[in-house]
């Protein structure tokens, strides 16, 4: 069963990050987020590159951005996009919709 990996609160995001060896949880207040981007990308599906979308969250806490792709988050991806767009607007976080 799939589970959510991005949770939005009024002023905070909770990100579940799945690594190679472990799963970690990152709490981010709105002032720690530099930008939220929706971008087009290519994703490998069954040995072929396919057009896809991704969410990129850049923060002050981490050197690397947090990336969530459409095919890995298939069940919740559209909900993530709606919630993050609303979160960015309400908390004055820089938001780019590059789709």
Locate each region found by the language model.
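Conserved beta-hairpin
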Residues: 1-27
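Acidic, Ser/Thr- and proline-rich intrinsically disordered linker/docking segments
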Residues: 34-99
């Amino acid at each position: 069963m799939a589970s959510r990996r991005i949770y939005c609160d009024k002023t905070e995001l909770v990100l579940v990050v799945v690594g190679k060896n472990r799963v970690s949880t990152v709490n981010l207040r709105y002032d720690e987020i530099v930008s939220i981007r929706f971008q087009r990308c290519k994703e490998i599906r069954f040995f072929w590159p396919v057009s896809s979308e991704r969410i990129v969250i850049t923060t002050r806490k981490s050197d690397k951005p947090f990336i969530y792709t459409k095919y890995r988050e298939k069940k919740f991806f559209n909900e993530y996009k709606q919630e993050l767009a609303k979160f960015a607007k309400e908390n004055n976080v820089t938001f780019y919709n590059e789709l």
